[in-house]
Swiss-Prot record:
Catalytic activity from the UniProt record: acetate + ATP + CoA = acetyl-CoA + AMP + diphosphate
Designated name of the protein: Acetyl-coenzyme A synthetase
Gene of this entry: acsA
NCBIfam families per UniProt: Ac_CoA_lig_AcsA, PRK00174.1
InterPro entries on file: Ac_CoA_lig (IPR011904), ACAS_N (IPR032387), AMP-bd_C (IPR025110), AMP-bd_C_sf (IPR045851), AMP-binding_CS (IPR020845), AMP-dep_synth/lig_dom (IPR000873), ANL_N_sf (IPR042099)
Amino acid sequence: MAETAKTAVLQEETRIFNTPQWIIEYSNSYQWMKKKGFKTEKEMREWCAQNYLDFWDEMAQTYADWFKPYTQILEWNPPYAKWFLGGKCNVAHNAVDRHAKSWRRNKVAYYFVGEPVGDTKTITYYQLYQAVNKMANGLKSLGVKKGDRVSIYLPMIPELPITMLACAKIGAIHSVVFSGFSAGGLQSRVTDAEAKVVVTSDGFYRRGKPLPLKPNVDEAVQNAPSVEKVVVVKRVGLDVPMKEGRDIWYHDLVKDQPAECYTEELDPEDRLFILYTSGTTGKPKGIEHAHGGFCVGPAYTTAWALDVHEEDVYWCTADCGWITGHSYVVYGPLCLGATSILYEGAPDYPDIGRWWSIIEEYGVSVFYTAPTAIRMFMKAGDQWPKKYNLKSIRILASVGEPLNPEAYVWFRNNIGGGQAPIIDTWWQTETGCHVIAPLPMTPEKPGSVAFPLPGFNTDIYDEDGNSVPLGYGGNIVQKTPWPSMLRAFFRDPERYMKEYWQMYWDIKPGTYLAGDKATRDKDGYWWIQGRIDDVLKVAGHRISNAEVESAAVSHPAVAEAAVIGKPDEVKGEVIVAFIILKEGVQESEDLKKDIAKHVRSVLGPVAYPEIVYFVKDVPKTRSGKIMRRVIKAKALGKPVGDISALANPESVENIPLIV
């Protein structure tokens, strides 16, 4: 068996958490299963995998509205897929127009909650429809046409989804750039996309202070010759320079525009957006997604995995600068006609109870966030959520990285009242929607993402293209295409082929390599182990970084952990752990030894961290992923490379030199 298959599971999670029967029976997926006559969840998942074209056809008919029906579900010429051939659609029609012209016209689409306490706004579907139409007409007045790119560099304010939807409506391609990126990060993305227009704001709020954003755009577009216009939202009232002939205020652009705008009837393969992935060196990867797939994948998974219903108040805390914001703040919930929270600010401003106060005030019933936030709340203590009434919560969900078992238990008990299932989701910018996740009916193992969702043929391969046995790990692959899959890298077909399809091309052409690895335990539950290159090689054993980190976090004094391998002449690598302690815990040499012993007791001697450091923070992306590449480079005295994607670049200095 190839070496990747030898990444064995060191620890078996035996705890099972079952969902209350009323939540199961209420869930969208359970009701579909019963309607179809399946007796078990396993039977349903297997049928949907084997009959994936029939399944996706039904999802496309259920969750999307088509101007013209498609005549062919899929044309698959690996590595290129075309879905819903012959049809006509537009995701803006599905997300906004059809609701504004139905009984939902006065239903709330977004409760906007600004960072300043009390800065709130309610936006109905009809109001959203009018705002999108005005902005769409505004963009057209600036010369934006079908296929043109529009870069969006905004904080989490209503104008962000409005501009995304306005682009979609007229067939323009949006490219959202996270507002935390510097001018350099923005410039590379605007230049690569050849954006005609950039939409930004004067500034944004961070922990109560208005900070400028527009100057980053001014700097970035100096070296972006494609940019003709810059549209500026007046958010914080800062005095910013406006370049005559190029810059225009958002409110001036839209104020006299008609509140009606024709929605382009598009081919399902027409591009909806380009989103640049970050965190690696070199040129950013512009991942292309299409209208047809985004009319289906995010809506289906919002309904099935997150179990969002008509009467729910749903909150995904992600920023729209990332794929989670695209799929689960904008397109998924809006295509369902759901009511969502749109929150601008930090999770702990003005205090660490801010999110819980929003859940209490708005009666949030489905709450989707990231492990890094959950661990931050754990560190602050149980007393904070206890101050608030969180009984409205029915479903919890997690995204961004594996949710370690201790954080799972804390989240379920303290936020979910010991009742709410936690939908721990694995997916990627490239997949467009959830791929592996429990359904509300799934018995859950803390730390596991359970099973591939209905409609996906997902497997774990060794390097020779063999499906690995239970108890072993390897590379996550997709054996068949799916509607919301990436269509290409923007103007880089060679990289697209090399990165995702080349690995198994000679053995099983059309096999998608995700770049992440996973294991399956004896019960078939999936455990995400991080990136393919995130593996420790200790004395001939291959050990997952994530598994060692999870063991460290199960120590009562530890809030968060990151581990790397340090080269060693004898063992190949020795394990080095960087530990963030819980509030009030005192650092000591004895505690370092105790944490190392604890990891050994949980995972065995092979996983013993020979070196333990206490740090205040570790480098993470804005989506909460620990940047082990950066930690390892800094610790070993090597160049750290591109750190523009870090949420906390100052944390790099916390990492000591260990050579």
